[in-house]
UniProtKB/Swiss-Prot annotation:
InterPro entries in UniProt: DNA_recombination_RmuC (IPR003798)
GO biological process: one example: DNA recombination
One Pfam family it belongs to: RmuC
Function: Involved in DNA recombination.
Gene3D superfamilies the record matches: 1.10.287.1490
SUPFAM superfamilies for the chain: Myosin rod fragments
Keywords, ordered alphabetically: Coiled coil, DNA recombination
Organism: Pasteurella multocida (strain Pm70)
Coiled-coil zones: 1-167
Stated name of the protein: DNA recombination protein RmuC homolog
Family listed: Belongs to the RmuC family.
Amino acid sequence: MQQDLNKTIEDFNQLLSKFEAVQQAKNQLEQHVVKYQTTAEGLQVRLIERDDKLAYLQKELDEEQARHNDIAEKITALKERFGIASAQAESLAKQLEHSQANFTRKEQENQELMAKLTTLSQELTELKTTLSEKEKHFAEQQQHIEQSKQQLSTEFQNLANRILDEKSRSFSQSNQTALDSLLKPFREQIEGFQKRVNEIHSESVKGNAGLEAEIKKVLEIGLNMSQQADNLTSALKGEKKTLGNWGEVQLERALQLAGLLEGEHYSAQAHLKDGEGKHNYPDFVLNLPDNKHLIIDSKMSLVAYESAVNAEDDLKRQNKLREHIKAIKNHIDDLSRKDYSNLIGMRSPNFVLMFIAVEPAYIEAMKMDPTLFNYGYEKNVILVSHTTLMPILRTVANLWRIERGNAEAKEISARAGDIYNQICVIAERLGKLGNTLSSASSHYNSTVTALVGQQGLVGKVERFKDLSAKANKTMPNVELLHHAVESERLDVIKADTPEAQPQKDNTAQ
């Protein structure tokens, strides 16, 4: 027993010696760790400097790439604009052909209506003539009937008087019967004649009523056509205020058909001032993205064009069309003098759109004077009709839709950038936490190995349990940790963004 105790003490002393040796090795290891940490800190400083340089070079590369992308986008945009302009030119040419065809068709329909009106007028004249003749014939028949009645009445009276004179003395019942027999044919003839007169009168009244109904229908058609012609004439050659209001209504209807909203995309009769403080009221101010504007005028006079449409011969028509072109040029000169594009608060191109509400008036003017468009263009006034204005208005509506999309895209991009930066910060912090956990796990496994390994302390002190009665506890089972923290995968996120490095520096501070 003493030998065992001595051996145990000897083993314990050896164990203490080993523990001291381990402690000395640990101290040396800690010194090496301090040395390596100092070296690592120097390497970390150099690594930070290298990262800063790489970030600077990456920034320059990104800026150069952005400039290259910007130039490429501008080239692409110019190509797209060229393609759009070509397509618009083709579309405008097709629309012009379609408008000319519509004008020809409308002109043919107008000629057909005029021919129909002429035919109806002739029929009305013929019906009036027929009615007059029938009334004259009826009056003659009435006169003839009255004459016949008077003649028969006179003859009957004469006959009755003569018979009465002859038979007055010997008048008897037989004579009375004979007189009745004699007068009966005359009475029947007079009654039949009166009946026929009444029938003729009834038929004449019915015929007159039907004729009057037909005449009323013809008159109503003529009045309706006359009213429509008066309305068109009033719209074309009415007072300036009426004509201006009509043009504004047509223009505002075109704006609404293009999907534009008043107060948001355009304003009517806006009150503006020029540099001298004079008041100006443009018909319509069209709002464009980037706080820009486009002015449209709609007060074009069409009196001369209305006269040309109603001209009786081609010479008068040509003269009135020349007056129509002169009126257009006068209005162009007036708009050019007003210089709407330089009004205070206006960011408008140096031209004004001059809207001609009647499409045929625009087409006839262009056919009569092909240089008319260039005349307005040189004075910064662009002539447009409903057909040519609608593509412009639809383009403006599309620009507003694109503007809304760009604003939403910018907002989404800003929010996405913030979210991405936050994810990078979280990934960086998770990486640090993972490194700390890996280091703690490594130290834990080393300590467990030293405690429960083949040469660990547990195996060496297990014998103390048998030697001491107080050793009543059971040594718990301590196992190594085998779960590795994959913090390297987070380095991909941190390396992809140049913002991660400044954020990491801020976090470290």
